[in-house]
């Protein structure tokens, strides 16, 4: 497989060229392919979260254990209803304060979310990124993008497209090169299936 690498900036998103690049990447996702893209934390390796075959490809490309859940990326609160079975009131307050941004929340999943995406668990991890390129891609790719960091398991999380290319070229359909990412650490994880919610992971 030849991996396509396209440079894109936030300023290009509303141009014809930018729309064409995002559209092509979105089509790859809708067809069950893999696209690496920038978020505000690290580069993510995206697939259609509701397509079990696509999610399986992420594990194969990364060499990731299949019981390690993937985070589902969305762009609006309305999208949460389709994938989260029970959304406690406190989740809306937390989302209002911290989304979009580097916070992942865990909910009981609906039947829409395949076990291939959740690592066999009955819960789903959800994040709403603030990066404009990521958000444009999620919308173009169907609204639900499963995306761990875009690297072979065990390697450092990538903060530049060059890192992704060195690691995953030939294994994925496309890399969106949006330059260096802002934070370079992965998101805080908050479990919303317990009361009160519990922090499971917080970057050092």
Describe the residue ranges of each PLM region:
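Active-site-adjacent structural elements in enzyme catalytic cores
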Residues: 1-204
């Amino acid at each position: 497989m030849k991996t396509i690498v396209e440079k894109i900036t936030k300023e290009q998103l509303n141009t014809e060229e930018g729309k064409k690049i995002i559209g092509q990447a979105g089509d790859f996702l809708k067809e069950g392919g893999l696209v690496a893209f920038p978020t505000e934390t690290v580069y993510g390796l995206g697939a259609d979260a509701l397509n079990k075959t696509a999610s399986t490809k992420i594990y194969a490309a990364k060499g990731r254990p299949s019981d390690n859940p993937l985070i589902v990326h969305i762009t609006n609160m309305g999208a949460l209803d389709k994938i989260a079975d029970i959304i406690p009131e406190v989740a809306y307050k937390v989302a209002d304060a911290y989304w979009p941004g580097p916070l992942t929340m865990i909910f009981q999943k609906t039947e829409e979310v395949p076990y291939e995406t959740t690592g066999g668990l009955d819960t789903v991890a959800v994040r709403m990124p603030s990066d404009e390129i990521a958000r444009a891609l999620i919308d173009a790719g169907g609204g639900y993008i499963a995306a761990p960091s875009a690297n072979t398991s065990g390697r450092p999380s990538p903060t530049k497209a060059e890192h992704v290319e060195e690691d995953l070229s030939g294994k994925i359909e496309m890399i969106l090169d949006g330059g260096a990412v802002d934070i370079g650490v992965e998101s805080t994880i908050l479990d919303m299936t317990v009361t009160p919610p519990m922090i499971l992971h917080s970057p050092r």
